[in-house]
Amino acid sequence: MRLNDGEVVSLLGPSGCGKTTLLKLASGIEKLQKGEIKLNDKIISSSNTHLSPDKRKVGYVFQDCALFPHLTILQNIFFGMNSKEISAQTNKIQNLMNEINISRLSDSFPHELSGGQQQQVALVRAIASDPKIILLDEPYSNLDSRLKEKIRDQMLHILREHNISALLVTHDPEEAMFMSDKIGVLNNGVVEQFGSPIDLYLRPKSAFIAEFFGEINLFEGSVDGGLVNTVLGTFKCSKKLNKNKVTIVIRNEAIKLYAVNKAMSEIVNENGFIVSPYFGYVMETRLLAGSTLIHLSLKVNQTNYHIHARIPGL
């Protein structure tokens, strides 16, 4: 993986896949056993090289904020900096605190702040030392959904405005897609795919990757030359397949529904869609935020297929 200047890269994956470990290696908290980590093309970690954390110019925002309870907010922000560094960064930090509306909290203590305010302080503290990169370890996991949206939007604007590179750990795909220029999906310590959010969403390399970015439907298919036959219709293959049986992955929002009184040929001619030769039945509908989830039943011979479709609005 490569993180360019000013980019935000997210590490996404299930619990225990190695996301936080990778952050600790990048920060220097843990030592690398194999491979290399470079910062501005200089090796900072390898099997025989280890630059200490204090010399890496890396900011770290922890999941629990890690603010010192006995220090005021301003003391927390400038902790570990000498008088010369504080003098050089004071105007920048004051402007940043004004921008996110926490300057009034300068003399407060961490326990007097809300969870969102503590995260804002943690970000300002990480920026205060003028790092080359900021590492963010699930910074919004303890916030409610509405506050999470507000804080992450605010954080992204700050990173962009100050051209700060960031490496973000999250298990939330929506958060990763919102925040990131690129995403690395980890599984069992291995980066399975690395690319832009749109690449991972539209061109996933596996069903594991596809399912991380939204619920999917799986269908068995039989290969016939350059075609794959399924209960949903016949699909063209983008490459040659050296097997007789495959699995088709289709996202909920890719399934379109039409009333039975509309001719299939009309649907195909209008939209170029692949049309199932079988009729489906609506079993249940559920209104979600901004969309409706529809449970469908498709009966083929003696087999019932349970399918999920998602349509905008009601």
Task: Mark where each language-model region is.
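Short beta-strand immediately N-terminal to the Walker A/P-loop
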Residues: 9-10, 60
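The feature captures the beta-strand-to-loop junction immediately N-terminal to the Walker
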Residues: 12-14
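Helix-to-loop junction immediately C-terminal to a conserved catalytic motif
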Residues: 27
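Conserved coupling/switch loops of ABC nucleotide-binding domains, chiefly the family-specific signature
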Residues: 33-36, 188
